[in-house]
């Protein structure tokens, strides 16, 4: 879940080939995610046991977040879209609240993953944003949504 303790910033140590700082992610599960994970593992195990399997590898909740199992999944979040700048980084057109000429398109705009591949919604939002840039922003550069 999105919260103020999960964020991206510029790494003070690591740089790319052009000398620019790399993006750094600070993220870990909070108590609510731990509770959800424990509950989900228990429900999964109860369902599996009710099927009387000959072998069962019981599900367990993770204690710390690690990127390793997510190398081929659909990560989301980072620059969340929303109705106002207090709760989000981007408006509904994926335009930055702070810098009106910055549009950020991708799965980063979702607060969390709903457990489905976000490619379809990301594509739809890309068209939505491109249409707003072409038909509104280029004609009158500035915020597309009042803050």
Set out the residue ranges of the language-model regions.
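FAD-dependent oxidoreductase catalytic-site/capping-region signature
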Residues: 1-103, 108-110, 130-147
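A conserved FAD-binding loop/helix module that cradles the flavin
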Residues: 112-133
């Amino acid at each position: 879940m999105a919260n103020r303790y999960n964020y991206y910033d510029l790494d003070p140590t690591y740089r790319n080939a052009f000398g620019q700082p790399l993006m750094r992610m600070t993220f870990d599960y909070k108590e609510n995610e731990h509770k959800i994970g424990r509950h989900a593992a228990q429900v999964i195990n109860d369902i599996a046991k009710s099927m009387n399997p000959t072998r069962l590898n019981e599900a367990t909740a993770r204690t710390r977040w690690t990127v390793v199992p997510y190398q081929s999944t659909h990560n989301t979040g980072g620059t969340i879209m929303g109705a106002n700048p207090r709760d989000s980084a981007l408006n509904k057109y994926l335009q930055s609240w702070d810098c009106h000429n910055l549009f950020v398109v991708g799965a980063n705009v979702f607060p969390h993953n709903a457990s489905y591949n976000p490619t379809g919604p990301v594509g739809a939002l890309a068209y939505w944003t491109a249409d707003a840039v072409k038909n509104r922003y280029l004609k009158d550069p500035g915020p597309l949504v009042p803050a």
